[in-house]
Curated annotation (Swiss-Prot):
Record bears the keyword Lyase: yes
Cleavable signal peptide: none
Protein name per the record: L-ectoine synthase
Primary role: Catalyzes the circularization of gamma-N-acetyl-alpha,gamma-diaminobutyric acid (ADABA) to ectoine (1,4,5,6-tetrahydro-2-methyl-4-pyrimidine carboxylic acid), which is an excellent osmoprotectant.
Species name: Marinococcus halophilus
Catalytic activity, as annotated: (2S)-4-acetamido-2-aminobutanoate = L-ectoine + H2O
Amino acid sequence: MKVIKLEDLLGTEREVDDGNWVSRRFIMKDDNMGYSVNDTIIRAGTETHIWYQNHLETVYCIEGDGEIETLSDNKVYQLEPGVLYALDKNDEHMLRGGSKDMRMVCVFNPPLSGREVHDENGVYPADLD
């Protein structure tokens, strides 16, 4: 069994800061669970283009506020604590931080290796290993 404390991830290679967001990666590919789990902070007032062509992601908002816009149809959904969204079709989207930092629990399949950052198209590589 694994028990992981957030405080033990801070300042390590499992904490990845991309400017608009900081992701603390609890479970990764090398944990052999078949998925990865991140605790991610989306910074207030930011806008990030994301298009996970190689991953599916489910996201649950636990703090703060913001919005997500699906670029295929320009629908905008408000995000606040208690809202979950699933990018089940590799949906290209814009993620916007609101008036406060937004804290999200993110699950990826296939799992992240831990070093991923978005490329110029908002994509994580399929596999860094």
